[in-house]
C-alpha cells in the first residue's frame, strides 16, 4: 500500500525542470521535490513541497531559477553545489564516488523533516 501523502519527485536535467513544474502546478500532491542540475524551470518559492536541488559545477541555471540565500532560508529550500561533479556525471557518466556523493546528499534531504 502506497502512502500517497508522502510522494517525492526527483529528476535530472529536463526531468528536474519537469519536477519543478509539477511542484509549481500541484504542490498539494507531493511532500518533496528534488532536482539534479535543472536549468530553466523556476523553483517555486513555497514551503510545500520541500524543495532541494543539487547543482553540477559546469552549467549555471537561467536567471531567477534558483532561490536567493534569503529565499532558501524563508522557504526552507536547499541548493547544494557539487564541486567536481558535472552535469553529465550525475547520470551514467559519473564515477561510483560521484554517485555515492549524490546519494548521500539525497538521503540526507529525504530524512529531514
What role is predicted for each listed range?
Residues 94-113:
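Catalytic active-site module of serine/aspartate enzymes centered on a nucleophile-bearing elbow/loop
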Residues 11-15, 19:
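Gly/Ala-rich beta-loop-alpha elbow adjacent to hydrolase catalytic centers
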Residues 1-8:
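Gly/Ser-rich "nucleophile elbow"/oxyanion-hole loop immediately N-terminal to the catalytic nucleophile
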Residues 21-31:
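Conserved hydrolase catalytic core segment
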Residues 25, 72-74, 112:
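Alpha-helix C-cap/termination motif
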Residues 32-92:
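The feature captures the conserved acid-bearing segment of alpha/beta-hydrolase catalytic domains
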Amino acid at each position: 500500500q502506497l502512502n500517497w501523502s508522502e510522494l517525492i519527485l526527483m529528476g535530472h536535467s529536463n526531468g528536474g525542470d519537469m519536477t519543478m513544474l509539477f511542484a509549481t502546478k500541484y504542490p498539494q500532491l507531493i511532500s518533496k521535490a528534488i532536482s539534479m542540475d535543472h536549468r530553466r524551470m523556476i523553483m517555486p518559492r513555497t514551503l510545500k513541497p520541500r524543495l532541494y536541488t543539487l547543482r553540477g559545477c559546469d552549467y549555471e541555471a537561467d536567471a531567477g531559477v534558483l532561490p536567493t540565500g534569503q529565499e532558501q532560508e524563508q522557504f526552507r529550500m536547499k541548493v547544494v553545489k557539487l564541486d567536481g561533479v558535472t552535469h553529465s556525471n550525475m547520470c551514467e557518466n559519473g564515477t561510483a564516488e560521484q554517485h555515492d556523493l549524490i546519494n548521500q546528499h539525497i538521503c540526507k534531504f529525504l530524512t529531514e523533516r
